[in-house]
């Protein structure tokens, strides 16, 4: 009688398994060794953490050496077709933000979910057989209905427009219909298609939007605008439209030719005096860059204008040393620039504590992609919001914020500076440095403190920027 009951129970169990779980390919017993984890065992056996826990009646992920686990290897028959709901979605090498980024896939891309991990991440197949891991909250069962303009920059001014739902409502001519060849005037607004001055850049491994902006002598914001990019993330093989500048907008390196103009205002004797006064200048690099911006807005900090910044201090504090040949014009111009630098330094010192205080107000708030605050944030939305509270305007994306700041070393970094990270496809994360190797940032787990050299951060650290 007991044998009969056992047979019936076993048969029922098999029936339930057949309908409630993936098909079992094979079963085996694994003896846990030191250093083993459920996730590691699941990966090596082609199953999932949840499947192992269910098969062994485990309520936690804790296992001990010598423990025997029944592992059912599952066949990958049950696969779900899903669509990317985010504008761009990072594909990582493992299930979590601690793993490196393999690439980014565009919103609306269809993917196949192979497995689901206990933390909500999915292993997916995309682009004809490539695999990786994504956060499951950015996948949906329905294809996104957001119309996407797919444009190709060629030698002739042709463009390919996706379905007719992409209404060209921004065309200035009232009578213009939604026909493909019509809106030539609108192409100046739709920046991705540019005239004869346009070229197409094929993204290669190691490319970043910042590097491309320097290479082509255009701004990060222009490249993002021309290609309808909402973030600075780009991927290998992506085609980017680059408009060659019609005016001579020289790259930063070429602006060295403007240096003699700054030197005309400063006699050689003043240069020597300013060097003697270097020890009293605590922020020589910052002051130099601010003054250079006043003289030549498109160039980075150059050595030539630096003496004029310190000249005013030399003339004011040590007239005996400056007795050789200071000119009145030098004092006048230097005074203007020195005042600007002094005010900027005072603003930075005064606003640092206010920035940190504002950032701390939002600790614990939730992360959301594209969140601008005040209830949810993404990383660059958080920094932009906090700085705006102190009257400082930042660009919207982490890449653009990186491009707009002055690069400084970690030894120079102070609370209130920005700290940047690159997961492999360009600047893709930013936080507010608070000192002692710590930052406040908006990441997948919300607004929180993080150690910039800790696990998941240190190997992606790019450097620091000062606003």
Curated annotation (Swiss-Prot):
User: From which domain of life does this come?
Assistant: Bacteria
Task: State which residue ranges cross the membrane.
Answer: none
GO MF term (any one): cysteine-type peptidase activity
Every copy of the SH3b domain together lies at: 79-143
Bias category Low complexity: which stretches? 172-185, 288-348
Q: Does the keyword NAD apply?
A: no
Where would I find the LysM domain in this sequence? 28-71, 199-242
Any idea of its EC number? Answer: 3.4.-.-
Show the active-site residues.
379, 429, 441
Q: Where is the signal peptide?
A: 1-27
The UniProt keywords, alphabetically, are: Hydrolase, Protease, Repeat, Signal, Thiol protease
Q: Which GO terms describe its biological process?
A: proteolysis
By sequence similarity, the record places it as follows: Belongs to the peptidase C40 family.
What's this protein's name?
Probable endopeptidase p60
Q: Which organism is it from?
A: Listeria innocua serovar 6a (strain ATCC BAA-680 / CLIP 11262)
């Amino acid at each position: 009688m007991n044998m009969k009951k056992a047979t019936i129970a076993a048969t029922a169990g098999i029936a339930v398994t057949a309908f409630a779980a993936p098909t079992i390919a094979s079963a085996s017993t694994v003896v846990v060794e030191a250093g083993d984890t459920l996730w590691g065992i699941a990966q090596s056996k082609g199953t999932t953490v949840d499947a192992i826990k269910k098969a062994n009646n485990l309520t936690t992920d804790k296992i001990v050496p010598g423990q025997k686990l029944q592992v059912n290897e599952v066949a990958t028959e049950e696969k779900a077709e899903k669509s990317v709901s985010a504008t761009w979605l990072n594909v990582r090498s493992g299930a979590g933000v601690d793993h490196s980024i393999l690439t980014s896939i565009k919103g609306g891309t269809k993917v196949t979910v192979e497995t689901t991990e206990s933390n909500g991440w999915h292993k997916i197949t995309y682009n004809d057989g490539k695999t990786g891991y994504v956060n499951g909250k950015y996948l949906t069962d329905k294809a996104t209905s957001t119309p996407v303009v797919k444009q190709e920059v060629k030698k002739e001014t042709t463009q390919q427009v996706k379905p007719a739902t992409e209404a060209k409502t921004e065309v200035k001519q009232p009578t213009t219909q939604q026909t493909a060849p019509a809106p030539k005037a609108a192409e100046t607004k739709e920046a991705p298609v540019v005239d004869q001055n346009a070229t197409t850049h094929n993204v290669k491994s190691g490319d970043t939007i910042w590097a491309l902006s320097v290479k082509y002598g255009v701004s990060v914001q222009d490249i993002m605008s021309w290609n309808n990019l909402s973030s600075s993330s780009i991927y290998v093989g992506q085609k980017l439209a680059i408009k060659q500048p019609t005016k001579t907008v020289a790259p930063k390196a070429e602006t060295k030719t403007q240096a003699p103009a700054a030197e005309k205002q400063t006699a050689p004797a003043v240069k020597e005096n300013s060097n003697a006064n270097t020890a009293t200048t605590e922020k020589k690099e910052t002051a130099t860059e601010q003054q250079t911006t006043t003289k030549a807005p498109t160039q980075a900090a150059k050595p030539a204008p630096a003496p004029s910044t310190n000249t005013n201090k030399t003339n004011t504090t040590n007239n005996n040393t400056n007795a050789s040949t200071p000119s009145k014009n030098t004092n006048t111009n230097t005074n203007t620039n020195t005042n600007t630098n002094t005010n900027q330094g005072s603003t930075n010192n005064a606003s640092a504590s206010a920035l940190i205080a504002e950032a701390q107000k939002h600790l614990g708030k939730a992360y959301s992609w594209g969140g601008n605050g005040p209830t949810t944030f993404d990383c660059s939305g958080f920094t932009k919001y906090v700085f705006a509270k102190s009257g400082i305007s930042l660009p919207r994306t982490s890449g653009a914020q990186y491009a707009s700041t002055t690069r400084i070393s970690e030894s120079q970094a102070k609370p209130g500076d920005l700290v940047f990270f690159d997961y492999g496809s360009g600047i893709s994360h930013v936080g507010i440095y608070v000192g002692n190797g710590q930052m406040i940032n908006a990441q997948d787990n919300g607004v929180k403190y993080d150690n910039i050299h800790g696990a998941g951060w240190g190997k992606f650290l790019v450097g620091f920027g000062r606003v």
